[in-house]
Structures are given as C-alpha cells and as structure tokens.
Design a protein with these regions (language model features):
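Short helix-to-turn junction characteristic of helix-turn-helix DNA-binding domains
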Residues: 54, 241-244, 292-293
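A short, N-terminal "cap"/entry segment at the start of jelly-roll beta-barrel domains
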Residues: 1-30, 142-172, 340-357
Length: 358
C-alpha cells in the first residue's frame, strides 16, 4: 500500500496561482496570519499552503526566531507550517501588512509596490484542501526552499527557529524541476487554453515532489508521520491500516503483521506518529467518512460500514467525538457551505487579466 498516495487521494490538495508581484526597493510586507489565510484565499478550505517563486532579484524573509533567509531568482519557497512572517528588500525595514496593499482577485493580477528602486519579482500561489490531515502536515517543517545551483537542486527545510536539517543536493530530477518551474512561470505570464487546470496541476506536482523529498531526506532523526512511514515496523503497520481501514484491527494484529511484539509496536508508533495505532485508525476513519459525506449520496448506514463501524449508532458517536457534530448535521452544513461559495471557488481558482506583465 502506497500510504502517501492514499492520503493525498483523500485529502485532495488543489493548486492555484494567486498573483504576480513586482516590488521595488525599498519595500517590506507582513504576511497575513496563518489562521486568516483560508478565509482570505480559499473560503471553506481547512488547509492553505502558500508558495512563492522568485523570478528576478533578491529579497529577505524573516520568520519567527530563525535567521533571515535569502531569497534569490529561481527559488521556490513553500510555507507549510510557517508563522506570520515578513518579506523585504533589505533587513531592518518596517513591514506593512500585505492585506493593506493587496486584495484577493478572481484573476491573476500583477501587484506593484515599493519605492521605485531595484526590482524583485515573484509568482505567488497556494495549495488548499477542504480536509486537513494533521499527521502529515504536522510532520512538515515550517518552510521549504528549493533552488537550482549549477544544474543541481538544493533543498533546505527550516523550522521557526533554525534549519530543520542540513541542505540536501540532488542531481537527479533537476532538469524536470527546472522545466516545471519555467512552465509554471511562463503559463502565468502568457496563459494558453486550459490555463487554470495547467497551473493547478503544476503546483500540485511540485508540492508532491517536496513531500517525497521530505519523506526521503528529511524525516530521518525526526519524529512525525513521515518518519513513521520510513520506519520498517511502524510503516508496515500504517500500510496495513490504510489498505483495510474497515477491518476490526487490534494492536496485536498490527504487531503480528509488522513482525514485532505488541509492546514494541505500541511504543514505537506512539514515539513517531504521536498517537496510538487505534487513535490513528479512528482519525483516519473520520477522514474517509468526511470524504464520503461530502462527495457521495450514500446513507449513513452504508458509510458506517465502509469505514469500519458495526452500527450507525457507533459511527454517530465516534463522528461526534472527533468532529464535534453528528454526521448528518456535518453533511448538511458542508453542502450549504459549498453551495454558497462563488463559482470560481468550487473548482480551480485561477483566471487571467490583461495585466500580466512581470
């Protein structure tokens, strides 16, 4: 079982380009607080992950207690768990809230701001999902920076206070990564047929590759869901749970399948994933249930059986315990929320204007 693919199938991240920006020195902007991003960019979403692609010039990004991060042309920066941060042409400038100088638009517009000096240009986008899968997102660092240097990819991961790990350099994949970044930037500037879908898929593809890099290169020595996937025994237990989530699993069953003792699996699972196997299973079943409630017309009894509950009553109790409301109420409220969204927020959220210069 490819657990990461299964999670991404259920969570369904969608990509979008928000705007292009042309900043001229001196300039300094303060990002919106993370808790306000969904309402500002993708109402109805539980997750919003902004990203920037620098296309010209340099800038400085300041985040939490981490040392300032230099951003250069060609860099991709992904703010997975980043706190509110500032972005400026040089250190020491007082930032202005970005919400004060730019309003979200249904079209890709070019935001121009600054004092008329040296130019810094970026493409700003985001990924969003109507379901938050905490074990995956909580295992990620605050920020990723991916850059090309002499035809080699350099990957950096940062927490709010330091680098997450030593940088990783990769020869493999550098060519396609560079081509994907170039295509996304070109498509933003000169949109062709299917522009909305092309930009969404490219954004998603780049983020998925970052997830794979995190799993391969940055999870060793750290705790979290991705580290659990890399562990031979916990990873096997996760594969079993995701392959058959409706099965009446016990820790003993999982330990036998993983080839370790019950005590060893329980201890290792809790250390890496942050919860017990049965707590994790209950949470994943709720992810599946919410997807069925949102996307299907199945009755509660059938959904209950599909996600592993012996009765509708047991499912109702579990859903209320995890989500806070009964499943029928959640389904009704979610349907009303989707119906009330603007048309451009019900699918990919990208369109174009005549002002595409950047």
């Amino acid at each position: 079982m490819d657990v990461l693919s299964e999670v991404l199938r259920v969570v369904r991240l969608s990509g979008a380009i928000h705007f292009c920006a042309e900043f001229t020195h001196p300039w300094a902007l303060l990002s919106s607080p993370p808790e306000r991003l969904a309402a500002r960019l993708a109402p109805g979403s539980e997750v919003v992950i902004p990203f920037h692609i620098a296309t010209e010039g340099t800038s400085w990004l300041s985040m939490g207690k981490a040392p300032p991060i230099l951003i250069e042309a060609g860099d991709l920066i992904v703010f997975v768990n980043a706190p509110q941060h500032s972005h400026a042409s040089e250190l020491g400038l007082t930032p202005v809230p970005v919400a004060d100088v730019f309003r979200p638009s249904e079209a890709i517009t070019t935001m121009r701001y600054g004092g008329g000096g040296k130019v810094f240009r970026i493409v700003c986008g985001y990924l969003h999902s109507d379901q938050r899968f905490g074990p995956l997102l909580d295992a990620m660092p605050a920020l990723f920076r991916v850059r090309m240097r002499d035809s080699v990819l350099q990957l950096d991961a940062f927490t709010n206070s330091e680098k997450h790990a030593e940088p990783v350099s990769l020869d493999q994949g550098a060519r396609w990564w560079s081509a994907a970044i170039d295509h996304l930037v070109t498509e933003t500037a000169k949109p062709g047929p299917g522009n909305r879908a092309v930009l969404a898929r490219l954004s998603e593809l780049l983020f998925m590759e970052i997830l794979r890099w995190q799993l391969t290169y940055f999870s060793a020595g750290h705790r979290g869901w991705l580290a659990g996937l890399n562990d031979p025994h916990v990873g096997r237990a996760l594969s079993l749970l995701h392959a058959a989530p409706a099965e009446p699993w016990t820790v003993e069953d999982l330990a036998e399948g993983a080839g370790v003792s019950r005590a060893t699996l329980a201890k290792r699972f809790l250390e890496l994933v942050g919860e017990t196997p049965m707590q994790y299973l209950a949470g994943w079943r709720m992810q599946l249930a919410r997807r069925e409630l949102r996307d299907s017309t199945l009755g509660l009894a059938e959904i209950s059986a599909r996600v592993g509950y012996a009765s509708e009553a047991a499912f109702n109790r579990a859903f209320r315990r995890h989500v806070g409301v009964p499943p029928a109420s959640w389904r009704q409220a979610n349907a009303a929320s989707i119906a009330s969204r603007p048309a451009n927020q019900k699918a990919a959220r990208i369109s174009t204007t005549s002002d595409q210069r950047h």
